Curated annotation (Swiss-Prot):
The keyword Membrane applies. One of its GO terms (molecular function) is proton-transporting ATPase activity, rotational mechanism. The keyword Isomerase does not apply. It is a peripheral membrane protein. This is A-type ATP synthase subunit A. Has multiple subunits with at least A(3), B(3), C, D, E, F, H, I and proteolipid K(x). It comes from the Archaea. It is found in: Cell membrane. It catalyses: ATP + H2O + 4 H(+)(in) = ADP + phosphate + 5 H(+)(out). Keywords: ATP synthesis, ATP-binding, Cell membrane, Hydrogen ion transport, Ion transport, Membrane, Nucleotide-binding, Translocase, Transport. Component of the A-type ATP synthase that produces ATP from ADP in the presence of a proton gradient across the membrane. The A chain is the catalytic subunit. InterPro entries: ATP-synt_VA_C, ATP-synth_a_Xtn, ATP_synth_asu-like_sf, ATPase_F1/V1/A1_a/bsu_N, ATPase_F1/V1/A1_a/bsu_N_sf, ATPase_F1/V1/A1_a/bsu_nucl-bd, ATPase_F1/V1_b/a_C, P-loop_NTPase. Its EC number is 7.1.2.2.
């Protein structure tokens, strides 16, 4: 089960390794560095090494494990900060006595789970019950915010059977908590199991994404919504607000469990993001957000190959919590760094480059990643539903959205939130370009908004979006001829579009009144602007100039409402404001006539 190194090229090692299998986990060299077989030619294996290869030399041993790179799934996973191959960074720091990650620290020294931790196990089944792979056998209370459900793992070797033994009590993570008698023999189930990171976890049926994932960001929730089980991309150049967007989503998105994957970002940016995440409180309970979060960190100064593993690792952890019946959100920042890692490894093992040097299978890998999102009926004998939502940032060089990663990503996502440097430099945040963004989930989430907020939601949303498009067309005329060339109706459109931008789309992520924005507040802010538009049209027909309408007290207050009205008071105060606005405009018309 071992071989020898033949040559080393950066993160790639070629070894004479008879019997090696694709994507098999191996240990490379005397210091046993993590590696994964990415190409096999006869008895020769090309290995991408997940640690720094400095000091390796030809002739050193390569040891096969016989199994693929796998995630360890079970209690003690919540609240941990892992590297790309699921080694706990805090444990590594204690072992190495150094803030920098020492090489050769394997799962034997720093296991992903604390297998000796004890939990009070409460069974959900009893002896004699029939169970299938994927069924919940019991639960442990891991944190104040999360109950960790223990599953009968849906591994290929597991079959339906009858519970032979299960008992309540205090157990270590590595203890057997149930025995299940199947046709293939008795299966001893522990609190944890392993799952290959590149293999999607099974489910019974994929459901349409019909419920919106409320994020508290108005531009996202109202204009370009994402559904639970959907996939979204946030492309943008340096300084356009991608990291703040990811932070806002991680804090306010109404998902039960959050997995931020910091993939290939700069070390100081990742450290800053981590410090911010560690300080965040859950808005609903005031408890630390870390009690419903697991973080994966793989900065740009860490070995390039581990970036690929970190994305798959985060998705696998997300699927595991989805299988417990939770709504899970995976936030990957950024997939461009992951693609760059793929490009480097592919070129080093001699694969034919495609567009801009990326491997020809880049679209396939992106599809594999985004297709793991979904709202599904889970495995097991009882019908349960869980969802995995993926939102990933993309960092196109120079903000060029035609480069391969961004252009291929567009094919596999349902929501596209491009960040505009022009908006970011003018201090308009979130800097989502409303003319380039889109969402394929508007039709599917419309029923939820109509039922839970207002039947008028779709009509008003579409009207505001069309006004923004008209504004862009009118701006061309204004640049050439000035506002004097516009009719009163067109001037009114520009005034309303200004209100949409300043009073609705703009949002201060650090203002507790402005962010998060509850669905009812979002709708009523939108309705207030729409009322100004509709009543204004009638006033203009009656001869009132657009400039006079803009000088009304209520209209002047419109852009400030988002920062004055809290979510709790939104229904009462905004409804009253809309009535006052209508009254003022109609009084203006009456005085004119």
């Amino acid at each position: 089960m071992s071989g020898k190194i033949e040559y080393i090229s950066g993160p790639v090692v070629k070894a004479d390794l008879p019997g090696a299998r694709l994507y098999e986990l191996v240990f490379v060299g005397e210091i046993r560095l993590f590696g994964e077989v990415v190409r096999v030619q006869g008895d020769k294996a090309f290995i991408q090494v997940y640690e720094d290869t400095t000091g390796l030399k030809p002739g050193e041993p390569v040891e096969r494990t016989g199994e693929p790179l796998s995630a360890w799934l079970g209690p003690t996973i919540i609240g941990k900060i892992y590297d790309g191959v699921q080694r706990p960074l805090k444990d590594i720091e204690e072992i190495s006595k150094n803030p920098f990650i020492a090489r050769g620290i394997g799962y034997d020294k720093a296991p992903p789970l604390d297998l000796k931790s004890e939990f009070d196990f409460r069974p959900a089944v009893k002896p004699g019950d029939e169970v299938s792979p994927g069924d919940v056998l019991g639960s442990v209370k891991e944190t104040e915010l999360m109950t960790h459900y223990i599953l009968y793992p849906p591994l290929p070797e597991h079959a339906p059977g009858v519970v032979e033994w299960v008992a309540e009590g205090k157990y270590k993570v590595d203890d057997v908590i149930a025995r299940i008698k199947t046709k293939r023999g008795v299966v001893e189930v522990k609190m944890w199991h392993k799952w290959p990171v590149r293999r999607p976890r099974p489910f019974r049926e994929k459901l349409p994404p019909v419920e919106p994932l409320i994020t508290g960001v108005r531009t996202v929730d109202t204009m370009f919504p994402i559904a639970k089980g959907g996939a979204a991309a946030v492309p943008g150049p340096f300084g356009s607000g991608k990291t703040v967007m990811i932070r806002t989503l991680s804090m306010f998105a109404q998902s039960r469990f959050i997995i931020p994957v910091l993939c290939g970002e700069r070390g100081n940016e990742a450290a800053d993001a981590l410090q911010g995440l560690l300080k965040l409180k859950d808005p609903a309970t005031g408890r630390p957000l870390l009690e419903r979060t697991t973080i994966i960190v793989n900065t740009s100064n860490m070995p390039v190959a581990a970036r690929e593993a970190s994305v798959y690792m985060g998705t696998t952890l997300g699927e595991y919590f989805r299988d417990q019946g939770y709504d899970v959100l995976v936030l990957a920042d950024s997939t461009s760094r992951w693609a760059e890692a793929m490009r480097e490894v592919a070129l080093r093992i001699g694969e034919m480059p495609s567009e801009e040097g990326y491997p020809a299978y880049l679209p396939t890998r992106l599809a594999e990643f985004y297709e793991r999102a979904g709202r599904v009926v889970l495995m097991g004998s009882k019908e349960r539903i869980g969802s995995l939502t993926i939102a990933a940032s993309v960092s196109p060089p120079g903000g060029d959205f035609t480069e391969p990663v961004t252009s291929n990503t567009l094919r596999f996502i349902g929501a596209f939130w491009p960040l505009s440097p022009r908006l970011a430099y003018s201090r308009h945040y979130p800097a989502i370009d409303w003319l380039a963004a889109f969402s394929r989930y508007v039709d599917t989430v419309e029923v939820w908004w109509s039922k839970n907020v207002s039947p008028e939601w779709r009509k008003i949303r579409d009207s505001l979006q069309s006004l923004l498009v008209k504004e862009a067309e009118l701006q061309e005329i204004v640049r050439i001829l000035g506002t004097e060339a516009l009719s009163e109706y067109e001037k009114h459109i520009l005034n309303v579009a200004f209100m949409i931008r300043e009073g609705f789309l703009k949002q201060d992520a650090y203002n507790p009144i402005d962010t998060p924005s509850a669905p009812i507040k979002q709708f009523l802010l939108m309705k207030a602007i729409y009322t100004y538009y509709e009543e204004g049209l009638k006033a203009i027909e009656a001869g009132v100039p657009a400039s006079a309408l803009r000088e009304l007290d209520s209209v002047k207050r419109l852009p400030r409402l988002r920062m004055e009205v809290t979510n709790d008071a939104a229904k009462e105060q905004l409804t009253k404001f809309i009535e006052t606005l209508v009254l003022e405009i109609r009084e203006k018309v009456a005085r004119k006539s």
